[in-house]
């Protein structure tokens, strides 16, 4: 993998990330294909209509079903899903966190109960890489120890703050330990001829504790990861705490490597964190919101189910050139949604993902032109009316 920063504008960066399967302009948004498909779309949609260069697949879900060995028999994710561009696979740590009622973390890894059949499994720093070697993704994420955050940590009582601090410190200690195990194992596997075209990213934990983030970032930057991710945000904390944490940790992340903010987020979150130096994003929001009838536009969000769109002949966004907006009206989409027609999911998902990918293109162009601040002002000015 090769990463090069081509242009900076303040802390915002425009660059290019090259894997064995695609050349990716950054900052980039990665659509989420949890079980090997972006919901309601196929590889042709992703490649030919949206021109997506990289998508995310989930190690936890692919491990449980159909199993990474099955995927390997098809030639990895690229052969199985027929998407011949890049894949990033997360480690499954977030899914274990989200299912924490059935999960137990210890010094060796994460023990969890399958949401499918109740069977018991144990993820370790090595086992999640073994799964990802079989998936043959371009970018693999290490196992990390995630902490649930309160919306406002400053509002906690003294005892609650002490408990949270203790848990965050444990998370950082474990994450650093697991990172060392992962990078050593990856070097060993590559020396044996495995994963030669696969890259490995470390994940920085530490909650909203700046000192903990600094410790974790500095430790992981000393390891030869191909990229570094900021994990453990957008898990309950208010947006301002997310932005402050990203801003605080950035000086301690190697500028020569791509920076990935995991699970984020809204268009506003993306703009704010690009300004702080983030290169890569992923989130289920564009497709999840699409299925629920919330569509993104340059001017805000549309709840397409609303009655005022029944006779609306306009496209979702008059400024949008996506597949859906060039063909269909708000009135038609309103009808499809109300009729529970499955076609709606595809058309709405194509639109929302186009919106996100086009937003990234506009951001890259603004950074390259040295006009990111102007772009940000216009972005917020157009959206000041809120939901349409």
UniProtKB/Swiss-Prot annotation:
One of its GO terms (molecular function) is tRNA-guanosine(34) queuine transglycosylase activity. It comes from the Bacteria. Pathway: tRNA modification; tRNA-queuosine biosynthesis. Keywords: Glycosyltransferase, Metal-binding, Queuosine biosynthesis, Transferase, tRNA processing, Zinc. Binds 1 zinc ion per subunit. SUPFAM superfamilies: tRNA-guanine transglycosylase. The active site is at 90 (proton acceptor), 282 (nucleophile). Disulfide bonds: none annotated. Its EC number is 2.4.2.29. One of its GO terms (biological process) is tRNA wobble guanine modification. Substrate binds at residues 90-94, 144, 205, 232. It is an enzyme of class 2 (transferase). Residues 263-269, 287-291 are annotated as: RNA binding. Its cofactor is Zn(2+). It catalyses: 7-aminomethyl-7-carbaguanine + guanosine(34) in tRNA = 7-aminomethyl-7-carbaguanosine(34) in tRNA + guanine. Belongs to the queuine tRNA-ribosyltransferase family. Catalyzes the base-exchange of a guanine (G) residue with the queuine precursor 7-aminomethyl-7-deazaguanine (PreQ1) at position 34 (anticodon wobble position) in tRNAs with GU(N) anticodons (tRNA-Asp, -Asn, -His and -Tyr). Catalysis occurs through a double-displacement mechanism. The nucleophile active site attacks the C1' of nucleotide 34 to detach the guanine base from the RNA, forming a covalent enzyme-RNA intermediate. The proton acceptor active site deprotonates the incoming PreQ1, allowing a nucleophilic attack on the C1' of the ribose to form the product. This is Queuine tRNA-ribosyltransferase. It comes from Campylobacter curvus (strain 525.92).
